[in-house]
């Protein structure tokens, strides 16, 4: 059994694979000051709830954009599973060709997303990941990663309004009843949710214009469904795209 772990700034996504089948998955809050033993206890509880026997785990693939946790999860895999985890980065063989100025700066999650989308949909393809930041990644028909964009995440945008505007407050991130709101809550929801859909439409349109063709737009991340419901720019939502990408990378690099 393969364990895939995507460590983001806000959440950690964990998936257990039996072959190509995702048999269990979890999402927990990222606590960057936790130690390996603390995460071990958390994993043990999750495995109990999911009916997963840790003795069956014989491989682990990890993407991490939180440097303090890289060593902790490596230690966890050594101690708990007796495996040497595959820590994904731009040097990990994936079959993708990086046509950007500094490939080493690419987050491992973006690499996993790009490979999974390219394998599933071919290219060109645009990948959107809605996380702490929202990332856009573009892969060509020949498997070249040619770049993308990074925008402030939806949560960051909403929090900035709450923290920096004295008379505004936190609101639930849901679709407002209509675009033209009639109270402050609906005003903010319209600006954040529908405004973000407009941001997606604008960047996708510009990227496809540079590519010279339309192409699939694949979205993943916690708020992908919310934004996809508000725009036709997103072709499909793949909730487990990053975990699937980690599985694919692991299979490519198995000894």
From Swiss-Prot:
Pfam families annotated for this entry?
Pan_kinase
Q: Which cofactor does it need?
A: NH4(+); K(+)
EC number(s) from the headed UniProt entry: 2.7.1.33
Compartments reported by the entry: Cytoplasm
- What is the catalytic activity of this protein? (R)-pantothenate + ATP = (R)-4'-phosphopantothenate + ADP + H(+)
Residues the record lists as binding ATP: 6-13, 132
Cellular component annotations (GO), alphabetically ordered: cytoplasm
Q: What InterPro entries does this protein's entry cite?
A: ATPase_NBD, Type_III_PanK
The residues annotated as the active site are 109
CC cofactor note: A monovalent cation. Ammonium or potassium.
Q: How does it assemble?
A: Homodimer.
Tell me, what does this protein do in biology? Answer: Catalyzes the phosphorylation of pantothenate (Pan), the first step in CoA biosynthesis.
The entry sums up its family as follows:
Belongs to the type III pantothenate kinase family.
Checking NCBIfam families in the record gives:
baf, PRK13318.1-6, PRK13321.1
Protein name per its UniProtKB record? Type III pantothenate kinase
- Name the species this protein comes from: Roseiflexus castenholzii (strain DSM 13941 / HLO8)
Native organism taxonomy? Bacteria, Bacillati, Chloroflexota, Chloroflexia, Chloroflexales
> What is the gene called?
coaX
